[in-house]
Amino acid sequence: MSERAPVVTIDGPSGAGKGTISQLLAQHLGWQLLDSGAIYRVLALAAIHHDVELENEESITLLAAHLDVKFLTGNDKDPVQVILEGEDVTTDIRTQECSNAASKVAAFPRVREALLRRQRAFRTAPGLIADGRDMGTVVFPTAPAKLYLTASAEERAQRRYNQLQDKGFDVNIERLLSEIIERDERDMNRPVAPLVPAEDAFVIDTSGKGIDEVLELALKYINEKLSSAN
């Protein structure tokens, strides 16, 4: 890992626009991209592919330490393209089987430690955009620029509703809103790495804002921070 390679962390709750803004920033700056929210799913899928028992902490930890994963800028449908061992698994990691397996492997402390090191290894020249929930507080606490994107639960539910409708799913917006509120409560009050802005994070409320406006605010902040750091 190069400590001199700059890193911009982007944290916040689901539906706040982290994925889209991370993709656009990575494209604009020509930097590496890390989607930390997908990494446990990727590890779970790798375990399934290699017939590794999900209950075997030692084997899963070894797999985590050598996980061959890349995150590329994607498209409007999937802002981040996930590549595992040279194969596009963007859709594969979203299955219920993969989700269930991810919950199992994430329960192992040694696996979490191995993936923490693996995530930090993404910090290479020319720079890194790190998208997640604890990037600025746990994974890259010394990052020179930290963003925290948020939005009202109602707006995030509407965005998620629109996304699922576009993909042909029949969804109930009231249920989505309830799930988002419950997840926020759980994430913000968990004892380990709770979802909170870093003390030195620049908070952007994306409610009622278009992508271009949020991107402009983010770039202005990042340029100011990186200029003062040099």
UniProtKB/Swiss-Prot annotation:
GO terms for cellular component: cytosol. Gene3D superfamilies: P-loop containing nucleotide triphosphate hydrolases (3.40.50.300). It comes from the Bacteria. CDD domains: CMPK. Its main location: cytoplasm. One of its GO terms (molecular function) is ATP binding. One of its GO terms (biological process) is pyrimidine nucleotide metabolic process. ATP binds at G12, P13, S14, G15, A16, G17, K18, G19, T20. InterPro entries: Cytidylate_kin, Cytidylate_kinase_dom, P-loop_NTPase. It catalyses: CMP + ATP = CDP + ADP; dCMP + ATP = dCDP + ADP. Keywords: ATP-binding, Cytoplasm, Kinase, Nucleotide-binding, Transferase. Belongs to the cytidylate kinase family. Type 1 subfamily. This is Cytidylate kinase. It comes from Shewanella putrefaciens (strain CN-32 / ATCC BAA-453). The gene is cmk.
